[in-house]
């Protein structure tokens, strides 16, 4: 599969700066949802970049450094569990994506606006040409790169959250609803970073 096929078509149409955008943590019971947007140089193909869920943590970390080194610009958007409970997870994910696009920054600290955005199966409320690509992290290198950046940054946050809330095993399951996590919730109750709207069936 040519992971630049979609990007190549857009470059041929005259779009120069093409961003990939993806989110991580949508299905978690705990913590923020996080999105990343990445703009890579025209024509650059990075070996091994694919959907972050198909990579080992070690390989994700390695590729994160390669992406960071080569990216024209990167941006991250984070939406808290509290806001997720207020506006629902889909809207929170879209807001995180929008924030990640608006926070795109070059290595020199300058803001960057892309000509076009490729988004993993979602539309962003922003006045920039875009396409929602189903299974985008498999079909577009830009979206796959964004998925890796988002996953690495959120996993690092999970390690920090685990130190603050040691009863739940967050570093191990990253906030997802594993048996260990559900049992800890029943034993200790939810922390302030748990998504109350996700816990109704567990804590009924």
Swiss-Prot record:
| Domain RNase H type-2, residue spans | 16-204
Q: Which HAMAP family match?
A: RNase_HII_B
Listed InterPro entries: RNase_HII, RNase_HII/HIII, RNase_HII/HIII_dom, RNaseH-like_sf, RNaseH_sf
- What keywords were assigned to this record? Cytoplasm, Endonuclease, Hydrolase, Manganese, Metal-binding, Nuclease
Question: What organism is this sequence from?
Answer: Alkaliphilus metalliredigens (strain QYMF)
Q: What does this protein do?
A: Endonuclease that specifically degrades the RNA of RNA-DNA hybrids.
Q: Where is the signal peptide?
A: none
Q: Which residues bind a divalent metal cation?
A: 22-23, 120
Cite the Gene3D superfamilies for this sequence. Ribonuclease H-like superfamily/Ribonuclease H
Does the keyword section mention Membrane?
no
According to the UniProt record, what class of enzyme is this?
A: hydrolase
Cellular localization per UniProt: Cytoplasm
Recorded superkingdom: Bacteria
Provide the GO MF annotations for this entry: manganese ion binding; RNA binding; RNA-DNA hybrid ribonuclease activity
Which cofactors does this protein require?
Mn(2+); Mg(2+)
Q: What is this protein called?
A: Ribonuclease HII
EC assignment: 3.1.26.4
Query: How is the cofactor bound, in the record's words?
Result: Manganese or magnesium. Binds 1 divalent metal ion per monomer in the absence of substrate. May bind a second metal ion after substrate binding.
């Amino acid at each position: 599969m040519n992971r630049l096929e979609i990007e190549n078509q857009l470059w041929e149409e005259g779009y120069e700066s093409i961003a990939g955008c993806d989110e991580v943590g949508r299905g978690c019971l705990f913590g923020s949802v996080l999105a990343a947007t990445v703009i890579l140089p025209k024509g650059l193909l990075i070996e091994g970049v694919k959907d972050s869920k198909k990579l080992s943590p070690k390989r994700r970390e390695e590729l994160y450094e390669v992406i960071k080194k080569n990216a024209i610009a990167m941006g991250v958007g984070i939406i808290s569990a509290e806001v997720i409970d207020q506006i629902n997870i889909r809207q929170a994910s879209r807001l995180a994506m929008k924030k990640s696009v608006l926070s795109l920054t070059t290595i020199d600290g300058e803001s960057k606006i892309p000509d076009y955005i490729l988004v993993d199966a979602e539309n962003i409320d922003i006045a920039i040409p875009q396409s929602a690509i189903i299974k985008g992290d498999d079909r577009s290198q830009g979206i796959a790169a964004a998925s890796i950046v988002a996953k690495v940054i959120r996993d690092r946050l999970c390690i920090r959250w685990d130190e603050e809330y040691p009863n739940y095993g967050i570093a191990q399951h990253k906030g997802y609803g594993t048996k260990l996590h559900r049992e800890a919730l029943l034993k200790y109750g939810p922390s302030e970073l748990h998504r109350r709207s996700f816990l109704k069936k567990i804590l009924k």
